[in-house]
Structure formats: C-alpha cells, structure tokens
Amino acid sequence: MRRRRSLLRLVAAIAVAGPAMAALTPASAAASWETVIAPSSFNDYNALAAEWAYLYPWGSDHNGSARMYGSATDHNHVSLSGGVLTLRAARINWNEGTSGSSPHLPIRYHSGAVHARDQVVVNDQFPNWEVKGDFQAPSARGTWPAFWLTGVNSWPPESDILEFKGDNRNWFNTFRTSSDVDSTIVGVSSPGSWHNYRAWITKVSATDVDIHYYIDGQWKAVHHARGFVGKPMWLIINLQMEGSSGSPGPSADTYYRARDVYVGRSRNY
C-alpha cells in the first residue's frame, strides 16, 4: 500500500509538471516519490529548526549591502507567524565595515536568510526534483530577494527560482559557468502579492539536467544545465539588499515572506 501511495504521488507530481513530463524516462516514472521538505516547515520554530538553518551556508555576508542575522534566540530578522516565514531588512545608521564577500560593499542593512539542511543532488538514485513555494517578494529599488540553489562544493552550479532585482521582473537564471548562463526574465504583476515559484529538475544524461521554471503553475522556460549531475546544491531563501538591485535602497524596513515551501524527489533505489 505504501508503494502504491508513493507511485500515485509521483504520477500527480508529473501531471503538474506539464512540459517537464516529456523529459521523464520510463525508469524514473516507475520510481517512488518522497517528500524532503514538507510545506509545514514554517509552522513553528521547532519545525523550522528541523529543516532549516539560519544565515547563508557560509555565514552572514554575500554580494550585497545586507548582513544576515538570525538564530534560535534572535528573531528580529527571521520570524514565523501563521505558517509564514518573514525576512526583514532594516537599514542601519552606523559603520559596520564591508561585506566579507565580493564585491565587498559597505554594510548598510541587517537582514535575514535561511538555508535547507537537506541538499539537492540529481543523480541516478534521485533523478527528479521539485522545488517550489509561495512568496511575497519586495521589488523596490535596492531590494534583492531570492529563492535559489547553489553549489555546496563549487560554484557553479546555480539555479535561481526567484530573484527580483529592484523591479517587477523575476530572473530565472541557470549558471553552468561564471560566463555561461541562461536567463529568462519574466514580468510579475504585483510581486508583493502571493505567487508560486517552482522548478522541476530532471536528469537527462549522465552529466546533465533540464530545469523547468514556473510561476503560478504556468511554464516559463527550460534551461539545459550541463554538468549538474552529482553536484550537491544548497537551497537558500534570503533578502539581500542593493548590489545588483540598485542603490540607494529603502530607508524603511523591507519584508520578504514565504509559505508552503516544498521539496520532493523521485527515488530509483
């Protein structure tokens, strides 16, 4: 009975995948489907701690002017309420130096980030992955929210499922190398309202995957990702500021919200 339920869940996931279904092989269609991160992971702080860790995987800084803060005892910038994760960026008025990551911008904000404890790795055992969630994303100049995958041991690989850079356009990006990038830019009506962002990732050869990108259930693009097979990736939700999203950023607090984030995969053995 358990095997039958798993198969039914896989069939349902494939049906929702739309164009991605054609990329599935008969072997993968016969696999079982399993949940890696359930939509309930933002229900309370115990559920959050079981599936997510605070900050970026590498620490507090990245490529913008916000430094990430958050812990089990500090919820000023990473908080939960009613099943919704809220990241809050607040401008600071003191000198906190520069970011430890290139391009080493001056720190002008405190903000929040979380990353999943489980990693996404496409291989023979787990050839298909679904990564999705509902988000209210800021889109004012200087705001840089993201929902993305990036390499654990090297960069690239990278897949940006949600990325707004100071306007109402979402950037679906797939980095194969630092200079070999596919970008599909899609205008989103009212990014600050709830929208669903989704990636369906499927193994298509011994080394490569296809990544299908969706907004609100509508297929937007497929990117061919050479060399992604076997490379573990972190899943990150963060609110960075300025940098590629322009400056100056807002003086008032900025909020980025997420709910019903889900990660699932097919298992061949």
Model-identified regions with their sequence ranges:
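Secretory targeting and sorting signals
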Residues: 1-29
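Low-complexity, Ser/Thr/Pro/Gly-rich disordered linker/stalk regions
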Residues: 30-129, 135-140, 152-153, 161-166, ...
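Short tryptophan-centered beta-strand motifs in secreted/extracellular beta-sheet-rich domains
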Residues: 42, 131-133, 193-204, 211-213
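Extracellular Ig-like/FN3 beta-sandwich strand-entry sites
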Residues: 128, 192-194, 232
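Beta-strand acidic-aromatic groove motif in beta-rich domains, primarily in extracellular
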Residues: 141-149, 207-210
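Surface-exposed loop/edge segments in extracytoplasmic proteins
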Residues: 157, 179-184, 218-223
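Short, aromatic/His-centered strand-loop micro-motif at the edge of beta-sheets
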Residues: 175-196
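Short, solvent-exposed beta-strand-to-loop segments that form ligand-recognition rims
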Residues: 215-236
